[in-house]
Amino acid sequence: MHDEQIKKNIQALIDDFKTNYQEYKKDSEASIETKLIEPLFFLLGWTKNDFDKQSKAQRGEKLGHADYAFYIGDKVVFFVEVKKVGIPLEREADKQVISYALSKRVSFAVSTNFEELKIFCVEQENALRNKFRVFNSPDEYLSNFDDLLFLSKESFEQGLTLKKAESEGRLKRRVSIDRRLLEDLMHMRSLIASDIEKSYPGKYQINEKDEIIQRIIDRLIFIRRCEDTGINLENLTLGEVQELPEDKAYLKLKEIFKRYNDVYNSGLFAIAKDNDCDKITINGAIIKKLAHYLYESKDGEYIYNFDWIDADVLGQVYEQYLGKLLAQTRSGKAKLTNGQAHRKEQGIYYTPTYIVDYIVKNTVGELVKNKKVKVKDIKILDPACGSGSFLIKAFDYLYNNLSSGKESKQYRIDGQGQYSIKTEILKNNIYGVDLDQKAVEITKLNLLLKAAEKNRRLPEEIDVHIKHGNSLIDDDTIAGLNAFK
């Protein structure tokens, strides 16, 4: 279809919209998508085979996934968020689709209700304010037709949209969402450390303080992940903590911790004998800040949704997080210093995702594919598990196989009459060891995040299966406390 015919058809769509505007205002988002948004993109060269559509009922309004993902081949090139006609495109909705695109490493995002349409190059610094293109009314689809064509299939196939963004200096890459999360986690770590030192001066050594801080942050991330995947406990969210007065914030947080321990029965929330995180009190103002930073970045540019952030990305964030060592200044303030040299001295290195994928595909993947052994009998050990990237990928392979295979029937039902493949995989298949105690705790967290299901107890075996020590040496005269027994 040539440009003049496209313009003619778009004009017909605009005329219909204007004529039936009051009726369109009554329509649901799903109806607007079918009657207006999809026809517009069809005129721009896209077909039904080029996009995935996810209904509000499927995804849950609060999870906030984009309405459409548009593909060139098997690669997503932009996301689209649709709102009802007559409802202004608000900043929060725009921020949401930008954050979603960033979390999925996609360069473009679109927000529209047909009355307005905004295109964002999400790699640009301040993308929310510096929009790639804006159409303030349907008439501008024609008056700015060349700009509208940047959303055409041909433009993405030929790389024209990306080239235009580059020529305008929009690809001076902004801080990625995982990098921002890392910075916010480190800021949170410093806030808690300074508050502990202020309230309990000299009571804790640096390593003891770090263990307390990590346990608290791990719990907060677990809770946020449960919220964003829709399996959180009713009326127990960090958002509620944010809304409370400072003098009640920490009490509410402790209540949430207790309820999560009661329901999930995981060591993550249990009162630990060797960790004082449940014995100390943290300033309410600090608690409210911690909660806020796990919903939205400190600079206000990102919305964090832990359902969007893949486990391997979270693992990478934690690997870098562990590379920073907590230190204390003479004034008593906490600061973070680069600890990469220390980690390398201990032989602690991060394994890139593509290598993890290759190893798992050619080991676990081959066993599962060729059915050389029953899945329930496979034992997988990572003797230097780090943050658990290999074990997480192995978990995914086993789970995907069991979910669709006959062998799943061989997994037993638990004591409550409930059946969980995820729990059984952690009980039967997954093992890990690492020299770094912090890495061990993060591996446990990442696996628990994988296994968590609404109101299902988590396996206690994870504390036995994921261990701290030197997997090569069992002689304590050589390895000391790190000797693996």
Question: How should each PLM-predicted stretch be described?
Answer:
Residues 26, 32, 54-61, 304-305, ...:
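SAM-dependent methyltransferase catalytic region
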Residues 44-49, 226-238, 325-328:
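Short helix-capping/linker segments at secondary-structure and domain boundaries
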Residues 1-21, 61-62, 72-76, 82-226, ...:
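Short, basic/polar, glycine-containing "phosphate-handling" surface segments that engage DNA
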Residues 37-40, 95-110, 415-416, 445-453:
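Metal-dependent nuclease catalytic cores in nucleic-acid-processing enzymes
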Residues 70-72, 83-86, 313, 319-322, ...:
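Short, flexible loop/turn elements at secondary-structure junctions
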Residues 224-225, 229-271, 381, 387:
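Extended, well-ordered alpha-helical scaffold/bundle regions in very large, multi-domain proteins
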Residues 44-74:
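Active-site metal-binding core of divalent-cation-utilizing nuclease and nuclease-like domains
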